[in-house]
Amino acid sequence: MIRYLKKQKLLILETEQTSYWIGLKYPAPICLYWGAKIAPEDADMFEPIRDHSSFDMELWRERLEYPVFDGRTFESVSLKADVPLNLHTKHVDVREQQAEIVLEDEAGRLEVCLVYRVFEACDVIQKSAKITAKESVRLTRLDSGACLLPHETKPWTAHYVVGAWAGEFRRRTAKLEEGELRLQSVHGMSGPHMNPFLIAANGEDEGTGEAYGVALGWSGCWQITASSTVFGNQRITAGMNDADFIFLMQSDENFETPPMFLCMSGGGIGALSRKMHDFERWHLKAGRKPRRVLYNSWEATLFDVCAEEQMILAERAAKMGVELFVVDDGWFGARNSDKAGLGDWTVNPEKFPNGLEELIDHVHKLGMDFGLWVEPESVNPDSDLYRAHPDWIHRLADCEPMTQRNQYLLDFSKPEVEAFALDMLRGLLNTYQISYLKWDMNRAMTDVCECLTPFEREKHVLALYRILDTLGREFPDVDIEACSGGGARVDLGMAARTAQFWVSDNTDPFDRLFIQEGYTLMYAPMMMSCWVTDTPKDGHKRGRDDWHYKFHAAMCGTLGIGADISKLSDEEMELFSEEIARYKTWRDVVQNGDLYRLQLPSCSNVAAVEYVSKDQNEAVLFLFMHSRKYGEVFPRVKMHGLKEDTHYSCDETGKVYAGKTMMNLGLSVGLHGDFDSRVCHFQAVKLQQSKK
């Protein structure tokens, strides 16, 4: 709900459990309060913001909703032009779930419209800014917005993630003290070195204290800053990265920034994660339909793809219960390595002499859907596409363009390149019965200089969005998985347009526990594609040999198989079939339920992750042991989110336990050797009353 109290000059945004108050008494709107719900009738409890000294006048500016560079503000700003801007509130427009505050520059150069949307059930507020130029103006910073943390006696700690290829989503913390913490990407995509979200929390653990989350829906270069002043004002800003940022706006041109999402929880970081997971499932592309168990043939064949071998793999995949068969890189052009063929999106006639239809028909007859890997944004120098259009890549004048993984990046800011990519994808989806695309991007964006070509990086991302949006409208039944050499493009901008993410090329089950911990801080398990693979030989990830351990780690998200199943023994085939069948019985709990990170792999030799159905009648508990010293005794694992007076049967032990017992006394870990693991499925049961 949104209320505008004109007399008190207050705009109040309310969700089920939170309030966000915006004061309009000052020349520009300020954030008065964001936190647990408060009563509108108590508006007079806010004290005036006083000056401190002649060195620190107009301290209300530290609380601005959208601070701009005006020559008078000393803190970080959200908007900066080539001239100072003096914005004043012009009018406020309120609808049931959306509000707009229109600000006008005193000199009439531009207009800023702050847009707010509320998602009440998830306690999420979406913010963005629409900029309209009244005359030509040069922008060098353009954030989505700002928000303020409340003054608390407990200090705030920032929680965020860092990483690199094959080591994404490593959790980090930092105290928010005087100064500035800056998270960012300058690589042309949202990761993998950092990810566009920040959580400020003051609890002792995941289930206590308050937590405030900020996430940005943008898949290009971004920045999030958390700044703290000596007067106790702690502001978080988020938006497109202003490093080498230039946007030349013409008169009457308008632009809306990427959305910024705010979420607050009084139940700690864990509750905040669950709210964001609900938001992503209910309001973004993920939806709530079950994710299919897939098989991807990449690790079985690499580039040596051929129809006959793929059909054999498909038969074995179907036998073990796979629902979606995916052919990865190597099916097109002269693609026998990563050195050639990228960009030539026609089926290789030597590998598929009867066309791709033969394999697709075979897959469908086996009862599976068919999927395909694509990398539409890249091109090899050794390709027909590049030889025909060498001007279609990002490049600097008088400079040899840089290759990464033997490829260039196509310049999607050019309309003809965007049109080519869209037509190519339309052609594939219209020609073949494809229900899934894995969209990859295996390099950073280089050879871009915005002082020469303003807004080029951003135009690339906007073109990417237009293509994905068009495909979503024209092919609503096709799921797209976002991939960028692993988890370099996981963000809410892609989550609005793709069904799931490939979060890392590292499929080592132990490493994945850490990656999945960091990922689920902000993103839903339903969107997390997890594979069971062979123990790798290339050294970029360390394998754990036990298939059960590998399956249990991969079952914590959307299960996939990436192993070379042609080499599995009969016993291993049976094991795969049993584990896949078991996952299917409770995958809805994992994919649509509430997640509790009970014990973190970064803090304990035993990691524990629990998923609880929304009606609290079903739960799945995963336990993973890293190592154990001789005689070491582990504390019981206390479950969360169950009904106290309900009894639950456990499929692993065959016993029945009371919800209150499992939450208060806890369960014995029951793990023994290094890299041991367990999965326990609990279902509510009715106990028969004994006769007196």
Q: Model segments located where?
A:
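C-terminal beta-strand-rich structural cap/linker in extracellular carbohydrate-active enzymes
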Residues: 659-692
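Conserved, mostly hydrophobic/aromatic
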Residues: 17, 129, 252, 295, ...
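Glycan-recognition surfaces
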Residues: 380-419, 461-566
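Short Pro-Gly-centered flexible turn/kink motifs
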Residues: 247-265, 677-685
